Amino acid sequence: MSLLDYTAVELAAKIKAGETTATEAMEAVIAQIEKSEDELNCYVTFDKEKALAAAKKADEDIKAGKLTGPLAGVPFAIKDNMCTEGMLTTCSSKILGNFVPTYTADAVERLQNAGAVIIGKTNMDEFAMGSTTETSAFGATKNPRNPEHVPGGSSGGSAAAVAANECFAALGSDTGGSIRQPASYCGVVGLKPTYGTVSRYGLIAYGSSLDQIGPLCKDVTDCATIMEAIAGKDDKDSTSIGRDDYSFTNALVDDVKGMKIGIPRDYFGEGLDPEVKEAVLNAAKVLESKGAIVEEFDLSLVEYAIPTYYTIAAAEASSNLERFDGVKYGYRTKEYEGLHNMYKKTRSEGFGPEVKRRIMLGSFVLSSGYYDAYYLKALRVKALIKKAFDEAFAKYDVILGPVAPTTAPKLGSSLSDPIKMYLGDIYTISVNLAGLPGLSVPCGKDKNGLPIGLQLIGDCFKENNIIRAGYAYEQARGRFE
């Protein structure tokens, strides 16, 4: 077994036992990056010497007993919308092409406190706006399973890096499916936690009421372990919520006997690829064979999730992105006449087409005369979607369905049709609107060998239910190759 084949938890155990070192692990990752990065383009920022120096420092601290966390010495990648002190943080945008933060995001800091060693920053859709990692100012990331296909987005660089063994695990962010969908496309595990579980301090905002940081990794055990490292109340984030229990690894139990699992009929209608449908329903049968009680039910309002999401997210984005104007940091246009012209030219030159599209949409729905008709109506529908999930979770422990309607599309096919790209988020978006946790676990491949993801959705603060179901399924499935 190659060093790169280990999961993050397995590697940490090997380092602790003295069977390998953080430096050896980092050298293996660097060799893999040098081998495949030119084709895949997973990283925006990668400094070989700094990564090696950080690994050597970790080895010294482990030897001295200073670094004892559950992820001590494990090389991690970080999505490029999380601030890292002294390391370029671009959001894959020209407008932040030279931005080096003076502080580190809370989730990244907690990860480092658990012993993780940062390799670099991964590529993403610009400002997390996209589902393919093709809107990046630094070029598209390709899917390691088949480089002619997209890795998903917006955390495509993180998912692809895990799948390509260019890191042992990574952090991503999820606003409407941006962890779960690339996890599905690349054949890795991804978790979007309950809103407020992981601090957003240091995460460059897209949709503030929807954004949440979470892990992308090789298996559910890694997922639970990373969650224990990064979750926690943070006074620097007003939306951070204190919880009684952060023991996610307690849910790593191969036992779903009596667990009630609901399958929404609405998720298996028109537009779902037959191969995806078959793989997901087969996964449900596996859980049923292990003692889970599986039933179909109707989850209303699914068809309203996409317009609701793109109204609310665009409105919040148009407000959040006002801060990027060329005054204090980031890109500034070279030639301009007066302050207003400088703002206009800087933003026109600095933002890409998809970001501009969403800023314009957001400005429109917030404008006088349209605010009530669009934005307020979307907030009301959001509340109804949450109510529909509340009613479902009164009956079920877990809701099971697909992550995406298809496997990974070919490069370029989504950019030419933005509506098609938006429709690809139909099964993930409502989870963000309701603030729920969602887990993506690989459950098969299509006829072309592209991975298919199983989505497990839990009630608020019930990550342990979906972790338990995902772990039990994984034990039956075996290692996903």
From Swiss-Prot:
It is an enzyme of class 6 (ligase). It catalyses: L-glutamyl-tRNA(Gln) + L-glutamine + ATP + H2O = L-glutaminyl-tRNA(Gln) + L-glutamate + ADP + phosphate + H(+). Pfam families: Amidase. The keyword ATP-binding applies. InterPro entries: Amidase, Amidase_CS, Amidase_dom, AS_sf, GatA. Residues 136-157 are annotated as: Disordered. Keywords: ATP-binding, Ligase, Nucleotide-binding, Protein biosynthesis. The keyword Heme does not apply. GO terms for molecular function: ATP binding; glutaminyl-tRNA synthase (glutamine-hydrolyzing) activity. Disulfide bonds: none annotated. GO terms for cellular component: glutamyl-tRNA(Gln) amidotransferase complex. GO terms for biological process: translation. Its EC number is 6.3.5.7. The active site is at 79 (charge relay system), 154 (charge relay system), 178 (acyl-ester intermediate). Belongs to the amidase family. GatA subfamily. Allows the formation of correctly charged Gln-tRNA(Gln) through the transamidation of misacylated Glu-tRNA(Gln) in organisms which lack glutaminyl-tRNA synthetase. The reaction takes place in the presence of glutamine and ATP through an activated gamma-phospho-Glu-tRNA(Gln). NCBIfam families: gatA. Heterotrimer of A, B and C subunits. This is Glutamyl-tRNA(Gln) amidotransferase subunit A.
